[in-house]
Amino acid sequence: MLWSTSGCSAPRPDNLGLKNNLLLSCPKSPNCVLSQVSDAKHKIKPIYYATSVEAAKERLNQVILSMDGTRIITQNEVYWHVEFTTRWLRFIDDVEFYFPESEALIHLRSASRSGYWDLGVNRKRTKGIRSRFEELAKGD
């Protein structure tokens, strides 16, 4: 039982945010994925869009709000931080979005706060976010 409660009580990590227009790197553990990295263990694709950045943000906001267990922590011009709480064990994962001013894409980073393995949860979550975003884009 201690294992299930430790996830929700994990403090917000220090390795969040932007530095030199980059999301911070993933730890060596496999429970993090990032679109601004080259190693295959952590690499994911960014989200591309063909609209204005404002329309892309609106679409991404729709996607986030449609998902269970979300809590928006930071939402400014170029950076968003969202906490995702898993349904059963109540673990908190941190998902970050970066909107570079000169590119029509959204960079992502998704990381578990606790543990070493995530059974692919962060990779699946980012794929799901990208899929839902692209599905909404088809309606434009």
Model-found features: residue ranges?
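Ser/Thr-rich, low-complexity intrinsically disordered terminal regions
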Residues: 3-140
